[in-house]
């Protein structure tokens, strides 16, 4: 293919077409040719950085290190993103070792690279909480909520944070501050879980006060759920009503044929019913 060497943008265009076709070796050649013709072509620099990033972070970092200051400035977002990825991996390794304070220090560096990031703030807060710096963790999440009051990601992250620290009612109240039309599937799933927890908590209290029939009636009014069916099965098993227990476990298995709790429960019921019959 004959290309007019004076027109670096024509070569860049060929690189973009190759990139769109995922023909990365050809895209790399065209972008390199573009840079030989015009070292200031920031689109070619960006194209190469993205190709190398797909291959490995190390290759992308080596490429970035070889650039001139002005070329490097044109892709500072890619450089920040690579740095962020590397810090995230290091922080995760420290979290897995229980080194929470060291992990938090790395999360702070990530937040400096990406200020206001909901999920980095969440991870930093979780690490601080685990490191015993709980008021600092709470303050970070509260400030984030004030900065981004109508951001569904923030609402979901703060809801997760609160519910993870035994503050289910506060989590629900926070979620309800966001108009329902803005709820995403993650928020809806979290709300369902929190409401289900509250219902089960109330039902367990009723049962413990001797009102098992009332507790059971309350659970049966709820939308079908594996947790509720397993609870009803467990209660029936404890009062040796094996027919009811078996029916509740079967309900679970109809929805989730591989549910281990229901399979084990049914086996226990069959053994207990056999002993009773014998």
Task: Indicate where each model-derived feature is located.
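Register position in tetratricopeptide repeats
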Residues: 2, 20, 50-54, 96, ...
């Amino acid at each position: 293919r004959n290309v007019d060497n004076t027109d670096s943008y024509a070569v860049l265009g060929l690189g973009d077409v190759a990139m769109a076709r995922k023909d990365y070796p050809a895209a790399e050649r065209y972008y390199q040719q573009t840079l030989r013709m015009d070292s200031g072509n920031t689109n070619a620099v960006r194209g190469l950085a993205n190709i190398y990033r797909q291959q490995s972070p190390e290759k992308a970092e080596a490429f970035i290190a070889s650039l001139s200051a002005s070329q490097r400035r044109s892709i500072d977002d890619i450089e920040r993103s690579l740095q962020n990825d590397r810090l995230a991996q290091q922080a995760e390794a420290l979290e897995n070792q229980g080194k929470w304070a060291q992990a938090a220090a790395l999360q702070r560096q990530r937040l400096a690279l990406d200020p206001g990031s909901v999920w980095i703030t969440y991870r930093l807060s979780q690490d601080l909480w685990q490191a015993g710096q709980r008021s600092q963790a709470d303050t970070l999440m509260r400030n984030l909520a004030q900065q981004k009051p109508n951001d569904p990601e923030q609402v979901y992250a703060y809801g997760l944070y609160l519910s993870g620290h035994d503050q289910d009612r506060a989590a629900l109240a926070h979620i309800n501050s966001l108009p329902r039309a803005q709820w995403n599937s993650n928020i809806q799933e979290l709300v369902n879980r929190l409401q289900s927890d509250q219902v089960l908590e109330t039902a367990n209290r009723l049962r413990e006060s001797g009102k098992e029939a009332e507790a059971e009636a309350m659970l049966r009014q709820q939308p079908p759920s594996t947790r509720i069916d397993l609870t009803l099965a467990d209660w029936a098993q404890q009062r040796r009503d094996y027919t009811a227990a078996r029916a509740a476990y079967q309900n679970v298995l109809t929805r989730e044929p591989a549910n281990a709790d229901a399979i084990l429960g049914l086996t226990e019921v069959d053994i207990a019913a056999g002993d009773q019959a014998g």
